[in-house]
Amino acid sequence: MKHGPIILIEDDADDKDVFQDILKDLKVFNPVVWFKNCDEAFSYLKTTSDQPFIIFCDVNIPGLNGIECKRQIDDNKELRKKSIPFVFCSTSVDQKTVDEAYTKMTVQGYFQKKNTYTELKETIKLIVAYWEECKHPNTK
């Protein structure tokens, strides 16, 4: 298992708790660094020496939304070098937003939050397994 922290950008504390419970059930023991907004996450990403394993981000967040957050990361030369996998996981899946995520930035996935724990667990399991196997510039 890649050991970098999993970054979760999610304003809903209940969703954060479910996400952490799922990772525990999946025996994924990477630390989870949780941010309620994109400004805090962006500040952390610019200053940390950690190489995060993956970023899970909601789209609908107060302040800078998830799309704008990803655009900010893409526009930062140092963060682009880190090649951190970035996945949207959101209840918002309108086609316009999905299209924008894939055509105007470098997003690695866009997933709808599932309605049940079991379905969401399966989605997160697939995402984590994929990125565990995937090679990218900062694979260690």
Protein language model regions, located:
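Acidic catalytic/metal-coordinating carboxylates
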Residues: 37, 65-71
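Alpha4 helix (beta4-alpha4-beta5 surface) of REC/receiver domains from two-component response regulators
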Residues: 68, 93-111, 115, 122
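Acidic, metal-coordinating helix/loop segments flanking the phosphotransfer/catalytic sites
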Residues: 34-54
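His-Asp phosphorelay/catalytic-motif detector in bacterial-type signaling
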Residues: 2, 28-29, 50-54, 79-85
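Active-site residues of response regulator receiver
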Residues: 57-62
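Hydrophobic/aromatic residues positioned on beta-strands within the core alpha/beta folds
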Residues: 89-90
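CheY-like receiver
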Residues: 119, 123-125, 129-140
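Conserved acidic segment of CheY-like receiver
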Residues: 3-14, 19-23
